[in-house]
């Protein structure tokens, strides 16, 4: 195999993309449907407050989620080797929003929003790998680890 062939072969190998492999969850049709979502790994951060607040809890939570997600995604370039690792595209951010004691939504009172924001992780990520990513991202990003929560192989509770 010549040098150019190796380059072409390497470029042809695509990273696993959750959006493409699980279209029913990430690219829904225009008609409502009830789906059964299988158990999966998620990084989750729970909070309360206005999502538009500059430097607020929500914006901090998003930076925490992405810091950990990308630390895990790029782990193959470090000394930390994750068993069963394969390259993947970090899935999109997902969010669950609600307001207590309000029927419907009161958009005028964004400070009363409760939220859980999550990013799905591949099944090969275990608790030890997650803890490594939290520690590594904390050193790198200087984000407060007390704001971090994980939901490993646990479905989000229906509210």
What is each of the regions a protein language model found here?
Residues 7-159:
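A solvent-exposed interaction/effector surface
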């Amino acid at each position: 195999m010549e040098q150019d062939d190796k380059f072409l072969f390497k470029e042809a190998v695509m990273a696993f993309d959750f959006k493409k492999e699980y279209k029913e969850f990430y690219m829904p049709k225009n008609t409502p449907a009830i789906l059964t979502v299988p158990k999966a790994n998620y990084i989750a951060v729970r909070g309360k407050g206005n999502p538009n607040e500059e430097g607020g809890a929500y914006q901090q939570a998003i930076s925490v989620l992405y810091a950990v997600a990308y630390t895990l995604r790029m782990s193959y370039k470090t000394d930390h080797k994750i068993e069963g690792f394969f390259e993947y595209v970090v899935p999109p951010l997902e969010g669950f929003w609600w307001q207590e004691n309000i029927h419907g939504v009161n958009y005028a009172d964004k400070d009363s929003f409760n939220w859980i924001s999550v990013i799905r992780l591949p099944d090969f990520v275990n608790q030890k790998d997650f803890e490594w990513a939290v520690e590594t991202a904390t050193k790198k990003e200087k984000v407060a680890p007390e704001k971090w929560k994980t939901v490993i192989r646990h479905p989000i509770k229906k509210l």
